[in-house]
Structures are given as C-alpha cells and as structure tokens.
A protein has these predicted regions:
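Sigma70-family region 2
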Residues: 11-12, 51-66, 85-87
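Short, charged helix-capping/linker segments at alpha-helix termini
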Residues: 11-20, 30-49, 164, 186-187
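Short helix-capping/turn signature of helix-turn-helix
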Residues: 24-27, 35-36, 125, 144-151
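C-terminal flanking helix
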Residues: 26, 30, 51, 136, ...
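Arg/Lys-rich amphipathic alpha helix in sigma70-family domain 2
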Residues: 59-62, 76-94
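DNA-recognition helix of helix-turn-helix
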Residues: 80, 127, 139, 145-148, ...
Length: 187
C-alpha cells in the first residue's frame, strides 16, 4: 500500500488501513517517544495517543508533508507535552513538600534500555540516555530523530518545522553538549 492509498483509506475510515498504519509506524513512534520521555510506559502511552490523534484528525492532514513527518511531529509534540506536565507536577510536588502537604514521592525516571541503541554494556546506555535527558529540548529532539530514528536533516527540519541549517546547528551543539556532559561524568 503506497502512502496516497493509505491516506485515502484512513480518511474513509478503513480499518485495514489503520491497522497497516499502526503496524508500519508503531515501533518508530515508540522509539521517538522513548528517546524524548525516556520511560517505556510513558512512551507506550505517547504512541497510543499519536495513533488516536491520527484517527481523529486525519481529515485535517493536507498532505503538505509526508505522512511519516506528520506522525513524527505529533509524537514529538505529545512527548514534549508529557515532559512539561511532568515538570509542572515536580514543581508543585516541591512546593507541597515545603509546606508539608506532599506525601507522595516525586516521579523519578527509571533505568531502561532503548530498543534502538545496541550498546555492549547497559551502563553505557544508561549514561548516554542520562546525558541526552540533560540536553535542551530542541537539541534532544534533533539528536533523537537523527541518531535513534535515522532521519535525515531534511526530514528533521520538516518534523521540527525549521531549516536544514538550523538542524545542523542543533546537532552540532547537541554533540558538543553530550561530549561535555559525558566527560564530566567520567572525571
């Protein structure tokens, strides 16, 4: 099934087209989400939300970009929304603890292994993802899409709605920052 047929099938409510979409893109969407949220359960939730949003809003897809670009954009946005809500909950939890009202522990990121990274040692994988988590938002997105999802700079620029030179700059700064973070940890 080519992309045009898939889009037409999705817009007509064809169940087989939706199943094909999920089967084709679920691993890629999950890998993108886990690269950003760094939690397997949250990444699964994000992936489900992406497909629900596609199901509900496919009629709004104008075809100005590839379907995969649209999916990555939704996955990135949903992942960032989750991180932002998590940060606001952490801030609120800190305020509650200051005033003695918060009895629940703050959410901590568990250790996990990203399915898209094949490293010999789990320790290296954990260090890498800890370092990626410290990157500024746009650098984290560009790095995740390029290194974990193997998207080209052109594809990343479409997902992030920016220019290719901007993506190149983000990748350069992400690599520099990761190098600094990882060097600091080995000292």
């Amino acid at each position: 099934m080519n992309e045009l047929e898939l889009i037409q099938g999705l817009k007509s409510g064809d169940e087989a087209s939706f199943k094909y979409l999920v089967d084709t893109y679920q691993d890629r969407i999950f890998n993108t989400a886990i690269g950003i949220v760094q939690n397997a359960e949250d990444a699964e939730d994000v992936a489900q939300e992406v497909f629900i949003q596609v199901y509900r809003s496919i009629h709004g897809f104008k075809g100005e970009s590839k379907l995969s670009t649209w999916l990555y954009r939704i996955a990135t946005t949903r992942s960032l929304d989750l991180l932002r809500s998590r940060k606001s909950k952490k801030r609120f939890g800190f305020v509650q603890r200051l005033f003695g009202d918060g009895n629940e522990p703050l959410y901590e990121l568990p250790d996990f292994n990203h399915p898209g990274i094949a490293l010999d040692r789990k320790e290296n994988s954990a260090k890498l993802f800890k370092a990626i988590a410290q990157l500024p938002e746009n650098q984290k997105i560009a790095f995740t899409l390029h290194k974990l999802e193997d998207l080209s700079y052109q594809e990343i620029s479409e997902v992030m709605e920016t220019s290719v030179p901007a993506v190149e700059s983000l990748m350069h700064r992400a690599k520099q920052n990761l190098r600094k973070i990882l060097e600091k940890e080995t000292d």
